[in-house]
Amino acid sequence: MSEIIVGGKYKVLKDRYYSETDEWILVKENIAIVGITDYAQKKLRDIVGVELPEIDKEVKANDPVAVVESVKAAADIYSPLSGKVIETNQKLTESPELINKDPYGEGWIFKLEISDRNEIEKLLSPEKYSELIKQREGL
C-alpha cells in the first residue's frame, strides 16, 4: 500500500481521504469507513477506551459521534461526512488498543452510509493532510 511518511514517523496512506480533525475516510461506493489517523493515535498515546456511535444514527458532517479515551486525554471523533451510521467496530470495546496497533486497519471505528457525496470534495487529500501535520509539527 502506498504511503507518505511525514517527519519520519507519521504514516499517511494514499488510498483514502482525511479530515482536519484527524479522521481518515476510506470510500467504497456509498459507504465510508472511518477511523483516526496514525498522527492522532500517536498524539493520544495509549488508548484505553472507545465510546462508539449508535447504529442507525443520522449524522451531519463535523458532528461529534464517538470518543476515544487515552491515559492522556479524551478526544471527540467527528463524522467527516453526512449520513447514517451502519456499523461500528465492536472489537474496540474489548481491545481499544487496536487503534494504536493498526489505526488504518483493525482500528477502524465506524462505517457510514454517505448521504451527500459532494461533501467528499471538502475532505483533504493525503498530500494536503501531510502538509497539515508538517505545519502543526513545525516540519
Swiss-Prot record:
One Pfam family from the record: GCV_H
InterPro entries documented for this protein: 2-oxoA_DH_lipoyl-BS, Biotin_lipoyl, GCV_H, GCV_H/Fam206, GCV_H_sub, Single_hybrid_motif
Protein keywords: Lipoyl
Record bears the keyword Ribonucleoprotein: no
Names of the cofactor(s): (R)-lipoate
Record note on cofactor: Binds 1 lipoyl cofactor covalently.
Domain named Lipoyl-binding: residues: 31-113
Stored Gene3D superfamilies: 2.40.50.100
Gene Ontology biological process terms, A to Z: glycine decarboxylation via glycine cleavage system
Family assignment from sequence similarity: Belongs to the GcvH family.
Record text on subunit structure and interactions: The glycine cleavage system is composed of four proteins: P, T, L and H.
NCBIfam families: gcvH, PRK01202.1
Function: The glycine cleavage system catalyzes the degradation of glycine. The H protein shuttles the methylamine group of glycine from the P protein to the T protein.
Protein name per its UniProtKB record: Probable glycine cleavage system H protein 1
Organism: Sulfurisphaera tokodaii (strain DSM 16993 / JCM 10545 / NBRC 100140 / 7) (Sulfolobus tokodaii)
